[in-house]
Amino acid sequence: MALSTQMNEQFYDSMADYYHLIFEDWDASMRRQGAAIAKLLPPPEEVGLILDVACGIGTQSLALAAIGYSVEGSDISAVEIARAQREAASRRLKCSFRVDDMRTLKTASVGRYGAIIAMDNALPHLDSDEDILSTFAAMRSSLLPGGKVLVSVRDYARHLQERHTCMPPVFYSDNGQRRIVFQVWDWIDERRYVVHLYVTQETVDGWTVHHFAGKYRAVTPEEIARFANQAGLQEVCVLPSSNTGFYQPIIVAEAA
């Protein structure tokens, strides 16, 4: 396992119990994200089975299942997969989850899915152009003819120019107790950085700080779109947030 892959697996393993805390209201965010993604997909009875290849604790998978889509989810983090399974059970949603690597999708059948998604800036965890191309090739192989790909990524153009070293903190309140979420970026080279994510919670006994570290490679939405084209996907375009209502730009593509 490559060092960056191992680091990111540990990043998400350690975050599994806390991931929902980066949202003001995780359930409300799930509903918004699910509605935005559904606008880019055919209705459930037409699209068939959807595969979420970076499902994490289930944010998008559960949201789509809740509005009638048939969804499978996979992720490199076994700990997050376990939580996604618990969340699906607690919500009585029929949504299956398993461990897999988006670069190979070894557990995904060829030509099985009507759509494949990878949201929340998942692809920039991949450490090379070859890894991104492999991911799109695995997606294409797993799609039905005409199947859709949706990938959301951070709009890195401004960050690459200005070399930001932190993101502004966001402040939430949980029944009167405060919560602060912020990021520090340690740049390794002109593209790669280690993100330090801090979740600071106020409790009756004081403040508790949770720290998680992962690695990203800043790849712009336009670059991601070119990789999708190179991998043989068609009708590739980048949709800005203003067009979709999703919080990140979305790259949309189709299998031949």
Task: Tell what function each PLM region has.
Residues 2-56:
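Conserved class I S-adenosyl-L-methionine
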Residues 61-104:
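Class I SAM-dependent methyltransferase SAM/SAH-binding core
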Residues 107-115:
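A short acidic, Gly/Pro-enriched loop at the edge of an enzyme's catalytic core
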Residues 114-130:
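A short SAM/SAH-binding and catalytic strip from SAM-dependent methyltransferases
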Residues 133-145:
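A short glycine-rich, Lys/Arg-flanked "PGG" loop and its adjoining helix->strand segment in the class I
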Residues 150-222:
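SAM-dependent methyltransferase
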Residues 217-256:
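C-terminal lobe and adjacent flexible extensions of AdoMet/dcAdoMet transferase-like proteins
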